[in-house]
Amino acid sequence: MRYLTAGESHGEALIAIIEGLPSNLFIDAEFINKELERRQKGYGRGGRMAIEKDEIHIISGVRDGKTTGAPLAMEIKNRDYKNWKDKKVPPVTRPRPGHADLPGSIKYNQRDIRNILERASARETAARVAVGSVAKLLLKELNISLKSRVLEIGGAKREEKWKRLIEKAKKEGDTLGGIIEIVIEGVPVGLGSHAQWDRKLDALLAYHVMSVQGIKGVEFGLGFEAARLPGSLVHDDIYYKENEGFYRKTNNAGGIEGGMSNGNPIVIRAAMKPIPTLLRPLDSVDIATKEETKAIYERSDVTAVEAAACVLEAVCAWVIADECLKKFGGDSVEELKRNYDTYLAYVRSF
């Protein structure tokens, strides 16, 4: 499968196109809308969330509620567009440190930074949540599920501290990042491959996780902690039980060994940096005058860690769904499930 997204933060709409979905997959619009709503929630979100009510509109690829095998096109309207479409917007010339503003303007020879920031905005992730929601619907057919949780915000591990830290950052014109954990359950042995570098499952997941705006680090299982421990305390012992097959008592590998899923839950943690749009802007240089100044302030969040958890679920769901289709094949959901059940029977008998 593959997908593309299009659209800008304050444009008319966001668009997503998915190619390669099997036919006869029930597209639950209510479920997709609930996932979009999840993305909009979280303490510390900005004023934009009071304007938008993200809802999916299916354009093509679905008939009588099920996919046909044709490309699936979806649209999410930007309600804030009506506030911008007839507005004379002055050019943005003061880039924000940590954002796409300056490198994007230089790369694409743009003297108005808005031509970069509109597409670079994390608003784009609404389209990816829609795509990931479709992937989740496909994985549900195979009894594979994802969940996420926020582990830290602003360095604090206890949830009762987060609200206080967010309020403090808001008063000081600052922003906060955090750490998110994603767990994927029900993944069978053998997704991904050791045979080529670009087929390794952890590499594919890391690539997609790192593509999410604001994510600066990723680890699996023990992650960086494994570097501080001897091998005898890191690697998961292998056991066997008749009628159940091979199993582990620990999951330090995070469900992936040698670039392949090993049957354990896949455990991923991602680090999100603080949002680079600050109410108390950092030092910058005006690209038009070359004079020292302060960066532009655009309406933004104090933190979006909870929202990012939903986005990370979506991109991970896409990877697992795509790998399932690569391995098991099937032009229809029925064919995919037959192939999948045959493989699971083989694994149990190995």
UniProtKB/Swiss-Prot annotation:
Gene name of this polypeptide: aroC
InterPro entries: Chorismate_synth, Chorismate_synth_AroC_sf, Chorismate_synthase_CS
SUPFAM superfamilies noted in UniProt: Chorismate synthase, AroC
Gene3D superfamilies named among the record's database cross-references: Chorismate synthase AroC (3.60.150.10)
Binding site for FMN: 119-121, 213-214, 258, 273-277, 299
Name of the molecule in the record: Chorismate synthase
Cofactor: binding comment: Reduced FMN (FMNH(2)).
Keywords: Amino-acid biosynthesis, Aromatic amino acid biosynthesis, FAD, Flavoprotein, FMN, Lyase, NADP
Associated pathway: Metabolic intermediate biosynthesis; chorismate biosynthesis; chorismate from D-erythrose 4-phosphate and phosphoenolpyruvate: step 7/7
Entry cofactors: FMNH2
Family, per entry: Belongs to the chorismate synthase family.
A UniProt-annotated Pfam family: Chorismate_synt
